[in-house]
């Protein structure tokens, strides 16, 4: 339902963005007070954001890993972001925790937790570790498993309401194309709680 107050807020109350063609949850505030407070919470890393992603190639190595690589504009292609040296003036620190959920010969289903919110962060970090997202042509991911958009879904959001103090937790079920991709690769997903998601 359209909120008439949204026109009075910057960016219509949108607190953070999702990449084009990424499915799932997004936070939209209804008042300026809440919007400003939520923007601060995200900057202070007080908002838990969990994403599901399908990466190309079978996962190898530890089931959990942290990718802490700075991200900046790709010098060769201004439409892309890239991992850059930490002393690069155009780079911003970025950290993603990645956990393997399911694996097969063609690729892997992973859960990603954002510690920072850089443009294309999960897509860049997954490509950097050798698992570009399925159908993410910008970062080298070929179409597979029936997916025609990058296989990235913002599944869970959790934060404390800035006014009431209530702990809020939202979950968005997988869209049909993502479910079909899992079926095509003979993978399954039955959900994971935010508390059980990562060991650290």
Locate the predicted segments by residue:
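RNA pseudouridine synthases
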Residues: 1-200
